C-alpha cells in the first residue's frame, strides 16, 4: 500500500525534433524528456521559450513529425515502451493533444518472437511518408500511411529540400491502413540479429536498408569466423506483402552498428571505420578511423587511423540533403564533431572523407553522451538543438558551414633546428633551418544561444545542510535555519557537479532590520530611489514614516496620519504626489508629506488598490468606490461613475489590472494588443467581473471561474436571477509572469489557501486555460486544512521585477512564491522557512519581508538557482585550479562536522600489467591503450564548497560505496563515533581475480590554514585492508558495519586499536550489488538472484536468514519501507522495474516468512541509481516514526515511495480508478499499461497496485462539479479526508525543513 510520487521531473532531453507542431508562424522545437513532452518556440532574441508542455503516462522512446492533412502543421508519431505507436496532433481549441490513431504491437511481438524482446523498440518513417515501421529484436510491424506521392508537393529551394506536405485526402479515407506484423525473417530468410533498419531515399516503392549479422562474432572468434556482418536493401510491396532484394553485401566489418541513408547513397557507421555504399548497392569506399579498423575489405580505403576516432553506438548524427551536398555531421560520445564529406558524379563516388570540425571555443567542455540532435541548417548558417545525457541541452548557432566542407590547406612552414643555440655557442653558422608541410583548417564558429537545464544522470544522493550552514545572517536568524537539502552527484566527465535540491527559496539577505511594531509596510520611491518606509500596526491603530536614505531615521511629518491604520500607500502623478489611504479616508501629500487634499469616508475602509490615477477601495459593508485624481490641478479627488449593475451585486474584493483580454469586445480595439485598465471584482458567488474606464454600464465576466473549469471564456455579465453567496475566492491577480519573456496569468487565491492559475491563450485573447503541470498543494477547500491560513492572513503581492523575474508572493504562516522561467511552466515554491506577515518592493530588484516577530530582511533571489523544475535546483561546481576530478560518484554527509565526502573517478591510460607488474602476453604497444580509472575522496566544506582535504587511491581503483555511520568503538562503554566507511574495487582485465579495499576514516578538527578559514577539518585514516573480492556495498548494523565482499556479506566490529575484526558472515549466490539496514535488520541484494532478508544478533555474533525473494531480480538498489510496524521492501532491477515485497510470516503461502510476499511491481521509465530512507513528516494524526524512500535516476528525476495506511489507500485507489475510467489519457498513454504491465504482474496482488501520484494529483485541478462527483462515490466526509491524504503526501518531506 504505497504511492509513487515524482518530486523532480526528468531533465535529460532524450529526443528532439524541429518542425511546426502547434504554430505555422513560429519556429518550433518538440522536445521529449522521458515522459514530458514540451514545445519550444524561438523568440526574437534567439531564445527558447516554452509554448506548451504535457506530462504523459509513459516514456517516449522515439517520435517523428508527419505531414497533416489540409494543414501546415505536422502531426506527431510517438513510440512508447510497449511498442505502441500514437499518432497525435495539436488541438487548437483545447490547446492540448488530440489522439488520431493508436497501434499496439507488443502482444503480437511477444507471440511472434523466438527470443526475448528488448525493452525499447525502433521506429522509422519512410522519407515520403508512405509507411512507418516498428522493429524489436526479430519482429517487425509496418503501418501504411495513406499519404500517396501524388498528394505531396515538394518545394526545393536554393539551400536544401523541404519535407513533403500533404495537400489533400480523399473523402472517407483514414490516415492509416491495417498494420502488417511479421517476423523479420519473412522479408528474407537470412535476416537475423538486426543491428539497424532504415527506410531509404529515391525509390518508387518503400525500400528498407537492413544491417544484420546472421552469425554472431566478436574479437575473440573473429579470426575463425571472419567478418560476418551483412547489409541488404529490400523493396517492399505493402499491398501485396511481397519483397524484392535489390542489393546485398556480405563480409562487412563486425563493428558496424548504424545505417545513415543519404540522397545519393548510404553510410555505414562502425566503431572503427566508415563505409560508403552507392544507391545501387555497391561498396565504394572505406575510411579507417583508428588502428583497430579492418584492412581485409575489398574496396578503396582511406587511412585516417591517425585521427584515433572510436564511434560507439551512442554516437549520433545530423543529416540534411542540400541541393549540391549531403550534410552529415557525426557527434561522438565525447562531443567531438566530425563532418563526413561525400562528393559524387552520378553514381561514381569521387570523394569520401572524415574531417574533425575545428571548434574554437570549448563549448562542449561540460557535455558528454549526446542523445539527439535536430535543427535547420544550410551552408551559411543554422541553428541546432542537441540533447545530452550529461550536460545541459544546447541551442546552438552554427555559422559558416562551408568550413566543414573545405579541405585542409597545406602550408609550408619554416622551422629552426633544435641545435641552433649550441651552434651559436660554438660560433658556428646559425642558418640551419628546414621546411615542413602543415595541414590547417579554418576554425568553425559555433555559439550558444540558449540551453535547457539538465542535472542528469544522478548517481547518488544524501541529506545535508546547504543554506542553513550559517545560523545567523546580518545579525538575524537564518531564514532557512535548520533546513536540510537533498544533495546529489550529477553528470559524467568534466561536466560532473553536485546538485542541491531545495524545497524552499533560499534568498540572499542584503540587509536586516528590527521593527517594534509592523503589520504592513510600504516603500515609497521618489525619482526612482527608495525614499520613505511607511509602516502600520493594525492592532495599535498607528502608522510611522522612516527616511530610508538617512539610515531609517523617523520622519516628522505633521500632516501624515500617524494615529490611524494605513490601508494603502502609493506615489502618484509621476512620483510628485503621495497618497495615504487610512481606515477613515484618503489623504494626498506632496513629496515632503505636506497635505494637499483630504477625503473623509464615513464607513471604515478595509481594502484599497491604487494605480495612478485611480483609487479603488471597499468598505466594511462591502460597498465599492473608485476615485480618480484630478488630471488638471492634481489636488482633488473625482468620484468615478460605476456601472449600475454593481449596486445589486455582493462584492468580496476588488483590484485594478492592466490587460488586453477583453479587447475583442471593445469597439476599435478588436485587433489591438494595447492593454486597458480593468477594474476587477470577485462577487459573493465566486464570479470574476470587470469593466474598463469607458464602460458605458457594460460589465464582463469570466465564465466558469466559479466552478474552476478547465477553460474560462470572457462574455458580457448577466446578473443571475438568484444569487447564493458562498465565497471561496479570496483574491485574484491578473499579471504578466516570467523572466525575459513575460506571459499573462490569472492567479486565484482561495480562502482555504489554495492557489489556482490560468494562462491566457496564445490563440484566443479572450480565453484562459488552467495550468495543471505538477501542482503544488498549498491549502484545501471547505476548511479541510485550516492550519495553513489561521495564524497569518494569506495575501497575494505582485512584483514586476524581482531579480529580473515578474513574480507573485503570497504571505502567510507558510509563504509562497509563484515564479516562471522562460523555458518552463509556472512553479510555486515555499518562500524561506519562516512566516512572512507583509512585504514591499526594495531597490531595483529586491523585496523587504517582515516575519511574525517583526524582523525585516531585504531578500534577493539567488541567481545561481534554477526555478523551472518542481524543486529549486542549484549546480555546485567542485573544481581545483590544478587538477580536474571528472566524474563525481558517491556522496555522504558527515553530520557531526557538517562536511561532505565525495568520491571522484577520472580516466587514465590503462597499463595492461600482470600481478607481477610485467606486461601481459599479447600486449601491443603500437595500439591505443584502453582507459583505466583512478579514484579518490574529497572533503568538501559547504560554507564555501572548497576542497579542504583529499585522499587519492591507487591506480585502477574505483570507489563503489561511501557511508557515514555511528560505529561502536568500545563494547563495554558502548561509546559510538561517526566514521566514514569506504568500499572500493580494483578494475583489471578479466583474467585476473577481482580485489578490493576497505577503508575506515575519521574526520578530525584541525587548525585552519592561513587565509583559509574553511580548512579546519581533515581526513584521519583509521583502518585499511586490501581484500580478495570487490567491496561493492557497505552499511551500518547495530553499531558495526557490513561490507559486501563480492558474494560474501561480512560484518566487522571496530576495536579500540582501530582494527576492524570480522565477526559474522553470510554467503550470497552470485554478487552483492546493494545492502541496507534498519535497526538490527538487513537486506542484501544479489546481481542475479533477488535479495535476502537477514537479522543480526550480537550475542553471539551471527547472521540469521529471515526470508528470501522468490523472484530472481537482477537487483540494482533496495531499501526498507517501514510503516506502522509493517516491514516492506522496495527493489529496483536492471529492467527498470520497482518491486514491493513484504515480510509476512502470518500468511500461509510465505512459509512462516521464509518466502517474502510479492505485493506488486511498478514500471519506471528510467534506471534507478540510488535509494535512501528518510524520516517522513506526519501532518495529521499521531507523530509516529514513519519513513519514505527517496530514489535518484539516470534521466535526472527523483522519486519518493510513500507508505499509506489502509483507509488512505482505499480512498486513493477509488479516486485513481475513477480518474482512469473517465479521463481521456493524453496521446493514448494508458497509466495501467505503462506502469503495471510487466512480467511480474501475475505474482502481485492485482487489486493492491502501487498508486501513481501523477494520476491522483489530477483530482486537485478537476472542476468542482467533477471533484464532487468523485467525492460522493468515495464516501462520507471524503472531501476532507482526501485533501488530508493529499497534503500528507505533499508535505511528507517537510521533515527536511523541521516544519510543523
From Swiss-Prot:
Keywords carried by this UniProt record: mRNA processing, Nucleus, RNA-binding
GO biological process, one term: mRNA processing
InterPro entries attached to this UniProt entry: Beta-prop_RSE1/DDB1/CPSF1_1st, Cleavage/polyA-sp_fac_asu_C, RSE1/DDB1/CFT1/CPSF1, WD40/YVTN_repeat-like_dom_sf
Pfam families (UniProt xref): Beta-prop_RSE1_1st, CPSF_A
Top-level taxonomic group: Eukaryota
Database matches in SUPFAM superfamilies: Tricorn protease N-terminal domain (SSF69304)
A GO molecular-function annotation: RNA binding
Principal localisation: nucleus
A GO cellular-component term linked to this record: nucleus
Location(s) in or outside the cell: Nucleus
Job of this protein: RNA-binding component of the cleavage and polyadenylation factor (CPF) complex, which plays a key role in polyadenylation-dependent pre-mRNA 3'-end formation and cooperates with cleavage factors including the CFIA complex and NAB4/CFIB. Involved in poly(A) site recognition. May be involved in coupling transcription termination and mRNA 3'-end formation.
Classification via PANTHER family: DNA REPAIR/RNA PROCESSING CPSF FAMILY
Family: Belongs to the CFT1 family.
Protein's UniProt name: Protein CFT1
Annotated organism of origin: Kluyveromyces lactis (strain ATCC 8585 / CBS 2359 / DSM 70799 / NBRC 1267 / NRRL Y-1140 / WM37) (Yeast)
Taxonomic placement: Eukaryota, Fungi, Dikarya, Ascomycota, Saccharomycotina
